[in-house]
Amino acid sequence: MQAKGLWSADEIAALSYGHYTTQLPKQGLPDPSREWTLMAAVIQIESVEDTKVIKKVVAMGTGTKCIGQAKLRKTGDVLQDSHAEIIAKRSFQRYLLHQLSLAVSDTKDCLFIPGTEKGKWMLRPEISFVFFTSHTPCGDASIIPVISHEDELGHPLPSEVTEKDHSSNNVCESVNTTYKRKVRSEEDIGFISKKMKHSIDEILTRPENYEEENRHDFPSTCQKALDVHRTGAKCVAGELQDSYSPGVNYHTVGVLRIKPGRGDRTMSMSCSDKMARWNVLGCQGALLMHFLQQPIYLSAVVVGKCPFSQDAMERALYNRCHKVLSLPCAFRLNRVQIIQSDLEFQHGRHALTKKDATRKLVPCGAAVSWSAVPHHPLDVTANGYRQGTTRKAIGSPQCRSRICKAEIFNTFRELVQRLSEKQRSESLSSQGLKTYWDYKAAAITYQEAWNCLRQQAFTSWIQTPRDFLMFS
C-alpha cells in the first residue's frame, strides 16, 4: 500500500537529515572543514488512517568508497561496496532480518503477517518503504548536463546526459546534444544502451546484432548545456563505451558501469545499476526470499537537492529494464516514484563548497551503518572493516562490519536454526545447504528472476566470482 499524497519529498529529506544529525556518532562522520560524504536512508511509511501516516527511519548509511579486487576475501568478512546507498540497503536487510525474527517469535508488533505458502511471510499491507539519497546515484542516473549554477544545484533537469561520480570534478565545454538509442536484436530484446553521437553525420561502428531503435533529441531547454558531469567510472566490457568526445558527447548513457578504484579496479557495479536491479528483484536479496512470499519493493526514491534529471533517473532505475519478460510469480518491474527535495545535505560536497569555494575537500574515508535493531544498531567502517582495524587483526570476527556478507549470513542461519521442519519453507528444506552460495542458489524464484533480468537487460553485469561466495 502506498500512502501517496500523505508525505512530501521535503518531509522525507528533513526526517533523514534529522536522523543523521541526532542518531549517528561523530566518529565516522566527515570533518566539514576538509571532508564531505554522502548519505542514504530507508524510511518506513505506515498508514494509520486515510489521511495520516507514521514515518520513521529504519536504516541509514553514509560512505563514498569501494575496495579493489585485490582486497576481496573468500571469507565474506569485508565490505566490498561502501557507497551510502549500498550501506543503507544492507542496513535495511539487517532490519528486515530482525523483523522476521520477531514474526517467527509470534510477536504481534512486527512488519510481517503469515503468507499463504508454507514458511513464508508477507509485508503488512499498510507498510511501504521510501528510499532517500542525498545525491543522484552514481552511474547512469547521474549522467546529466551542466547548464547553469542555479539549475545544477536547485531544480530537476529534463535532459539525458552524465554521471558525476562520488569523487569526480566538473569540466565545461560546449557541443550538441543528440544521441542514438541502440538495442540488441531479438536474442537480447531487453538489452538497451544509448550512445552519444559524435556529430549528426557520423555513423557509429557497432556489432551486426545491434540495430537502431530510435533517436531522441534533448528538449530545447537543454540546448544551452555546456557539458556533462564527468566520471571516472568505466563502462563494463561488452557494453558500448564512452566516446570521450568534448562536452556533452563525452559519455555513453544507458550502459552498465563499474565504480572507480584508486589503482586497483573494483568489481562493484554502479549504484544506478544496483538500484535498477532492486526494482526487479526487490531490496531484500536472495537469502531473505526463503522467508518472504513476495519481494520487498521501494514505493519511492527521494533525492536531495543536487544535480538531478528526472529523465536520467527514470532511464537508469527502470526504463532500462522495461522489456524484461517472463519473470516468475511475485516478481515484476517496479516503476518506483522518483521525486526531488529542495533540501540540501549539510555534509555534501556542494553544500560545503558553497560555504567556502577556496577550501580543498576530500571524500570521507569512513562509512557509517545504522539499523533500527535493539542491539548494536551502529557500525563504523573504513576500508571494508571496523574502523581502527589493523592489518594484523584482519580475519578476526571483531573486525567485521555487522552488515558484511559473513555477518548477514550468520544472522540468517541463526533464524533458520530456530525454525522446526514444519515452519521452514520448501526452499529451506533442500538437502545439502551449507555455504552462503548454497543458500543463495536455493532461493529458486529469486535466481530465476535474476537470470531473466541478466539475460534480457543486463547481459554484461559483472558478478562476484563463485569462490568468494563459498564460505560457511
Swiss-Prot record:
Catalytic reaction equation(s): adenosine(37) in tRNA(Ala) + H2O + H(+) = inosine(37) in tRNA(Ala) + NH4(+)
Keyword Zinc attributed: yes
Binding site for 1D-myo-inositol hexakisphosphate: R90, K274, R277, K405, K440
Keyword tRNA processing appears in the UniProt entry: yes
Highest taxon, organism lineage: Eukaryota
Domain (A to I editase) ranges: 59-471
UniProt: Zn(2+) binding residues: H83, C138, C271
Cofactor names: 1D-myo-inositol hexakisphosphate
Single GO term (MF): tRNA-specific adenosine deaminase activity
Protein family: Belongs to the ADAT1 family.
Record-given protein name: tRNA-specific adenosine deaminase 1
Annotated source species: Xenopus tropicalis
